[in-house]
Amino acid sequence: MTELSSEARAIVEGRHSDPFHYLGCHRETDRKVVRVYLPDASEVRLIDETGEEIILTRIHDAGLFLGDLPDRAERYRLRARYGADLVELEDPYRFPPILDDFDLYLLGEGTHQRIYDKLGAHPMAMEGVDGAGFVVLAPNARAVAVVGDFNFWDRRRHPMRVRGNGYWELFIPGARAGDRYKFAITAQDGSLLPLKSDPMAFAAEVRPNTASIIFDQARLPRPTPLAATINARGVPISIYEVHLGSWRRSDGNRWLSYRELAETLPDYVRELGFTHIELMPVNEHPFDGSWGYQPTGLYAPTSRFGSPEDFAHLIDACHREGLGLLLDWVPGHFPDDPHGLGRFDGTSLYEHANPLQGRHLDWDTLIYNYGRTEVVNFLVANALFWLDRYGIDGLRVDAVASMLYLDYSRPEGGWIPNKHGGRENLEAIEFLRRFNREVFGRFPNATTVAEESTAWPQVSRPIEFGGLGFGYKWNMGWMHDTLSYFEKDPIHRKHHHDQILFGLHYAFSENFILPLSHDEVVHGKRSILGRMPGDDWQRFANLRAYYAFMFGHPGKKLMFMGAEFGQEREWNHDHALDWHLLDQARHQGVQAVVRDLNKLYREVPALHEFDCDPAGFEWIVANDADHSVFAWMRKGASGRARCLVIANLTPTIHRDYRVRVPFTGRWREALNTDSAHYGGSNVGNDGAIETSGEIIPELVLTLPPLGVIFLVPEAA
């Protein structure tokens, strides 16, 4: 055996950053030399295009072989002996690069909108040879190799080469869709890191296994398109929030698959009148108890419920029912599981190195470094990926407040101010603006929603006017105030009248969604029904009234699964909803009132056209605290598009209650939550009522106990 050069030694020791510089075919003065590294092979032959075989010389026991390629030959294959077996294979180090110069330029700038076409693992053919191309970012690594089903998980066999800006790549002949793989990374100090999953993996193993899976994105079907106005501010938007693992389950408490869900979920949601489904995070994640909010695979739909094609099938099933599909998206933090993004290349690549910036104290997770162009590119492209490849209709961004504030949930002295000495995360602000700019730039009919729990201004206002550029914002203040009010015994509500009034002072400062989300039915808060006071009759009456109050209030609507039929228990992600409750009439009544509220909301323009515009709202009765009565007029674009909403939030019937209205004539009682159909006492106004009063028209009404009524003027 000859003494190895320093370059050959680096190959054998797995620390060469450009194995192509040594391996493969190279012209040396007057000959073409082929160097091959095949650990454990006892003999290697080179087969040129004519079929001629050339025995390569073994130059090191580690598996280095050397030989000459005839000048006439352009391509070659290898035949290697492993024990008694002869194996024909292609040499990965004879193929051209995967990334071109333009890719490298855009990646360096951090402006490559379609990194999912290049990074990760892609089945492809090079020079007529089938295989898969692998590209990964690891700028501070000494060496990176691909390990997987195609090479016995041996980190010696497929070292990658580094290109510009720290992107490593390799085409591996014979690797194919369905193969599992990971990256074996050597840090600069020579230490071997835990095998890493691919940050750009498009599929992954079911937990607790953590390997990435090669997936061909060309297999994804294109979903049925929806109307361009599906997310517009002037249309009804009523969202059903779902956790796929616990909506329903099969025998033995087994999860339903994406395809099983596609057979039932969209039809159920459409039949109840919702316009959208919002899925809690489906990105791959290791811990069931995180509900998906601690993802390790942003580009892979979780394999718990099936394949990427199966998930695309579920989206298409929603679209075929006319339902928009929103995904919860988590660009704020990620877990520090060893196979994940944390210290990916031996350094804090995706996260801040300083724990005062890089670790979230509430969740013990890592925080993305929005000051790195590669990280921002990775996240923004991920949002575009779901819209482009899967055809979803929008993204709800989780925990925006934790991104915006450097001192979020941190003690005094436990955070680092920005360059101006303030607590605003300037890099996160720019990231969110870029995210919205690029989403709406490429997908103008999509929407984005912010879960932002503070009073940060202009979250859903245009970027050019100083806003963050979101389409909508969750109205957390409305949710807290109204739940607090409705939880109180009706006898005390008159002392808290302002909790209802206050929300209208800011109801149009943003494009709001009124959220009754999963966060309100966990951690000891009880279910929505469980928070309602009184005996059983009053609890259900309060619940129906609360939902009607929500649908009559300005703002788009969101309801977490189970709330639509009065789930009694808190939500538990390990079990299905209590569907057996629908055997009881009172729960059927709750479901029926939600169905009818959705129908009314869709069909009455006054209830949705100006959801986000003060022109669509007028208080009629705001100061009757003694009776806990509220009345307001919702207005639409046309002159007679009106809907009067009246809420009596005590168990006392109020008769001869006078309310002024803009039009004389007959007003139809479009919905009454106290109807016997819903389980109420059937107190109301016989379905319609004529105005009285010659100068100022008014309605003399009977207000049902713990009830809300909707009245619309009949055609003149």
Curated annotation (Swiss-Prot):
InterPro entries with a match to the protein in the record: A-amylase/branching_C (IPR006048), Branching_enzy (IPR037439), GlgB (IPR006407), GlgB_N (IPR054169), GlgB_N_E_set_prok (IPR044143), Glyco_hydro_13_cat_dom (IPR006047), Glyco_hydro_13_N (IPR004193), Glyco_hydro_b (IPR013780)
Keywords: Carbohydrate metabolism, Glycogen biosynthesis, Glycogen metabolism, Glycosyltransferase, Transferase
Biological or metabolic pathway of the protein: Glycan biosynthesis; glycogen biosynthesis
Biological-process GO terms, alphabetical: glycogen biosynthetic process
SS bond partners: none
SUPFAM superfamilies linked: (Trans)glycosidases (SSF51445), E set domains (SSF81296), Glycosyl hydrolase domain (SSF51011)
E.C. no: 2.4.1.18
Catalytic activity: Transfers a segment of a (1->4)-alpha-D-glucan chain to a primary hydroxy group in a similar glucan chain
Keyword hit for Nucleotide-binding: no
Active site, renumbered: 398, 451
GO molecular function, one term: hydrolase activity, hydrolyzing O-glycosyl compounds
GO cellular component, one term: cytosol
Pfam families per UniProt: Alpha-amylase (PF00128), Alpha-amylase_C (PF02806), CBM_48 (PF02922), GlgB_N (PF22019)
Enzyme class: transferase
Quaternary structure and partners: Monomer.
Function of the molecule: Catalyzes the formation of the alpha-1,6-glucosidic linkages in glycogen by scission of a 1,4-alpha-linked oligosaccharide from growing alpha-1,4-glucan chains and the subsequent attachment of the oligosaccharide to the alpha-1,6 position.
Family indicated by similarity: Belongs to the glycosyl hydrolase 13 family. GlgB subfamily.
Entry protein name: 1,4-alpha-glucan branching enzyme GlgB
Provenance organism: Nitrobacter winogradskyi (strain ATCC 25391 / DSM 10237 / CIP 104748 / NCIMB 11846 / Nb-255)
Protein encoded by which gene: glgB
